[in-house]
Amino acid sequence: MIKLFNTLSKRVEVFKPIDDVVKIYCCGVTVYDLCHLGHARSYIAWDVLRRFLIYSDFKVKYVQNFTDIDDKILKRAKEESSSMKEVSEKNIIEFHKDMDSLGIMRPDSMPRATNHICNICSFITILEDKGYAYSRDGDVYYSVFKNKNYGKLSNQNIQEQNINKQGRMANEENNKKQNPQDFALWKKAKNDEPFFDSPWGRGRPGWHIECSAMVKDELGDTIDIHLGGSDLIFPHHENEIAQSEAANGKKLANYWLHNGMVNVNGQKMSKSLKNFKTIRELIKSGISPMTLRYFVMTVNYRKPLDFTEEALRSAAEAWKNINLALSFMDLTKGAFRSIDKNESIEEEYKEKLSFELSQKKLKFSEALGNDLNTAGAIAIIYDLAKPLKNFLNQFQRIEGLKIDLNEKFFLLENFKTLEKLTEVLGLKKEVLVKERKITEEEISSLINERLKAKKGKNYAKADEIRNLLKEKGIELIDQSKEITTWIRV
């Protein structure tokens, strides 16, 4: 059973798909710049949802759009002395690079607004014919007061909104709109802007109508799940509902899911506030893509995610341990490839282990099924990784280590389960570069050098050696003044 918090009903609901294929639409990026951590947070959350639905034997059709015509794109094109198309094409390529690096599955379809102009115009015409839209001098607006259900997603009071907006609008806009709260479906082209031909003259679509038209064209009138950031609830998603349900006479989406924002010093991370870190910058600074992915999943998708250096360091340490366990087969040099046919495991032990692992899988599914509790799912991952990591520390230090047959079977089955469940979270093994940069002889030599430094009261040198080894994945354990052991972390 999968339960999800539905923004529309304001409660957690059992997920019930419309038919055999779960239809999901996710609001995509406006392609004028590189993606930041806030984008990563959103698309990682929805990637986990998609992977978990597939793991739970659902068929999924996942659509995510590109907004490739917008004021921000036009502004960037002007700044770069290029065209709207050049700016969007360049940033679509960069978007894919970033998402691929984070292990985010590519959507089944990624429609672009500029490829749906005919559908958008048809959609607006339907709204006009039904009395929900009106044109003024080349602009077309949606009449909010014609829709009695407007505000049902965001709980906005349209009467109060209307009073508050009165007087804040330019006279020209006031003269065109029937009510200040009405929003643009089609915008008349300015002299220096790209344009598309339409029944209302040259212009371009409004932001909200793009998604309504693409949802209908790609997935139909009613979909299972609509996704986006909490900053899109109003006005974007509220306006989508108003447009689509007025035009189609049907519910737009059964479930509305929204992720929380990434905060920096208590403020939302955003390009407008100039307090953002791009995914590219973070990775270039030495943070691995899977560390970023792990970091995002440590907090439930609906809650704010506080971006701090300390939290990132903690995520890096935690991911390093899981990654070590995922590298189990590589680091054991083939010793665990299989159980020999002549080796027999007691059936009673097999059944016991099978039951224990099935319980862990069940708890994993229960965690993700409880409104995508990724932190709970990670706890199960840690439980599976721990014995593998502990064994690796012994295996790498003790030459000719003898392995009990039951232990071998236990570790192999644990590893297989770990691999399967980390795939559901989209966590993939990263190359252990540091593990290959230092030998056991070098470790012993540095430990001896450190002991000499400590005896000579050169504690700065001793700390320098400890930190050097830690950077290479070696944690020192001082058992006494004379004895220091180590483990790989």
UniProtKB/Swiss-Prot annotation:
Gene3D superfamilies: Cysteine-tRNA ligase, C-terminal anti-codon recognition domain, HUPs
Gene Ontology CC: cytosol
Catalytically driven reaction(s): tRNA(Cys) + L-cysteine + ATP = L-cysteinyl-tRNA(Cys) + AMP + diphosphate
Motif ('KMSKS' region): 268-272
Entry note: cofactor: Binds 1 zinc ion per subunit.
Residues the record lists as binding Zn(2+): 27, 211, 236, 240
Co-factor requirement: Zn(2+)
Documented EC number(s): 6.1.1.16
InterPro entries assigned to the protein according to its UniProt record, in alphabetical order: Cys-tRNA-ligase (IPR015803), Cys-tRNA-synt_Ia_DALR (IPR015273), Cys-tRNA/MSH_ligase (IPR024909), Rossmann-like_a/b/a_fold (IPR014729), tRNA-synt_1_cat_dom (IPR032678), tRNAsynth_Ia_anticodon-bd (IPR009080)
UniProt KW Transferase keyword: no
UniProt keyword terms in alphabetical order: Aminoacyl-tRNA synthetase, ATP-binding, Cytoplasm, Ligase, Metal-binding, Nucleotide-binding, Protein biosynthesis, Zinc
One function term, GO molecular function aspect: ATP binding
Binding-site residues, ATP: 271
Major site of localization recorded for this protein: cytoplasm
Uppermost EC category: ligase
Subcellular compartments: Cytoplasm
Biological processes, Gene Ontology terms: cysteinyl-tRNA aminoacylation
Motif mapping: 'HIGH' region: 29-39
HAMAP family documented for this protein: Cys_tRNA_synth
Subunit relationships: Monomer.
Family: Belongs to the class-I aminoacyl-tRNA synthetase family.
Protein name: Cysteine--tRNA ligase
